[in-house]
Structures are given as C-alpha cells and as structure tokens.
Amino acid sequence: MNKHTEAECKVIKSDGLEVEISSGSMTRLAGVSQGLVGAEGIHLAVANIPPGCASSPHHHVNCESAIYVSKGSGRFLTGPQLETTLDIEVGDFIYVPQGSVHQPINDSLSDPLELIVARNTPVEIVEEYEVS
C-alpha cells in the first residue's frame, strides 16, 4: 500500500544555504535542516576547512553523523584524547557515533577540505571539547 502526502519536495540552491556554525576554522552550511525546510528527522550540510586548518575538537550530543569526503584530504582525529588518527581522502565515508569526540584537519597547504555531513536529527547539539 502506498502512502501519499501533501508535503512537497524542495530544492535548496547553493545561494540559499543556511549558515550554521563555525568550529575552529571550519564553516558549515546546511541545505536540509529544520529551519530551512522543516525537516523532522534529518540534517544535511557541507563543511569546508581551509588549507592548513582544522575544526575545534567537538562532539555531537544528540546524533550520529555520516560524512563523505567530497574534496581534499587530511586527517580525522578521534578518541577522548584525540589519540586515534584516521587518514581521509576524496571518496571516503566516515561514521561518527553519538558523543564521539573528533576533529577533522586539512593538512594541505593549497587545497580546501570539503565534507558532506548527514545527521539523524534536524537540529544538532554540538559541544566543543577540551583535550586535557
């Protein structure tokens, strides 16, 4: 049996993205969010990290993340003391469990690192994390 609703599909153009957060040198723009399209269970954004820069160490209190590396390469630090280093490059997928401390780093001195980020909540709660 098919269910049909009156809800309409929406296209968000690149000039209509929602500016979200800056974490360290990383900026993130949402294309699908509660505020932008009324999403009820999903969030999709593009994160950009300039050459030689990184996000702040952080974790997401209320959601898992799935990340796709669409441009560039670098490292993805994870663990309570960011003690685990994962090399990342174009085409890689990254799974981040809820509450997992992480920090993407762009090692390139010339190319940006671009990450497509999906989450299983329309509104995320991000907490910056201080490594001791």
Residue ranges of model-derived segments:
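Conserved hydrophobic/aromatic beta-strand scaffold that supports enzyme active sites
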Residues: 44-48, 66, 85, 93-95, ...
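A short beta-strand-loop-beta hairpin characteristic of the jelly-roll/cupin
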Residues: 54, 63-90
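Ligand-binding loop in jelly-roll beta-barrel domains
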Residues: 85, 89-90, 98-125
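A short, N-terminal "cap"/entry segment at the start of jelly-roll beta-barrel domains
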Residues: 1-41, 56, 128-132
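Histidine-centered divalent metal-coordination motifs
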Residues: 58-60, 102
